[in-house]
Design a protein with these regions (language model features):
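Substrate-binding/catalytic cleft of secreted carbohydrate-active enzymes
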Residues: 2-197
Length: 197
């Protein structure tokens, strides 16, 4: 999973050889209708990503943004147009508007907007993704109570259910080491500032 950044071609080359599958995001794809220059740069970035990576068999999904909420109609129109432009360049991949925060089963929702492989239609349902990155971290017996009662069970039979960030944290972070490293730099970045709070 190339999460929040464009994938590394060396990694994709190895993934192609090993038969691994990847999900790629351009990173930073946050359009703003008041910023046409920024929108043009972001559009160019995502188009270049598709042109560069469309020949990699390991790549199965393009995702525009990580965990984006609902967009105003003008912004949503720009996002969907970028997805359509990607489709023209690569008809073979699933293209998602965003990952996570589907609001319910089998309902239309901006979090579910996608374009399917070899299809030009923009769908507002049929793809369900909800993140629980913290998850249980490791398996424990309490997660399975029976064939109809277990962790990640879904009754959603009409959509593809994808838990994109599921139990992503399997060990405690090295917080003291992170703090030491971040304090060496004057600019901490958005996430560095969060880590030091």
């Amino acid at each position: 999973n190339f999460h929040r950044f464009i994938g590394n071609t060396d990694v994709m080359n190895y993934a192609d050889e090993l038969g691994l599958l990847y999900f790629e995001e351009p990173g930073g794809f946050r359009l703003d209708v008041r910023q046409p220059f920024m929108n043009a740069v972001l559009h160019e970035k995502v188009i270049r990503m598709v042109k560069r990576d469309r020949s990699h068999p390991c790549l199965v999904i393009y995702n525009m943004m990580n965990e984006s909420g609902n967009a105003a109609p003008e912004k949503l129109e720009l996002e969907i147009q970028a997805m359509k432009d990607m489709r023209v360049l690569d008809p073979s991949r699933l293209i998602l508007r965003t990952s996570a925060w589907a609001k319910g089963d089998d309902i239309e929702d901006q979090a579910k907007i996608h374009i399917r492989p070899y299809d030009e239609k923009v769908y507002w349902s049929g793809w369900y993704d909800y993140h629980r990155a913290g998850g249980p971290a490791v398996w424990n017996e309490g997660l399975y109570k029976g064939p109809d009662d277990y962790y990640n069970d879904t009754k959603n039979k009409r959509e593809i259910v994808f838990f994109g960030e599921e139990g992503a944290l399997s060990s405690p972070p090295r917080l003291e080491k992170n703090k030491e490293d971040l304090e060496k730099y004057s600019y901490k970045g958005w996430d560095g500032r969060e880590f030091l709070r």
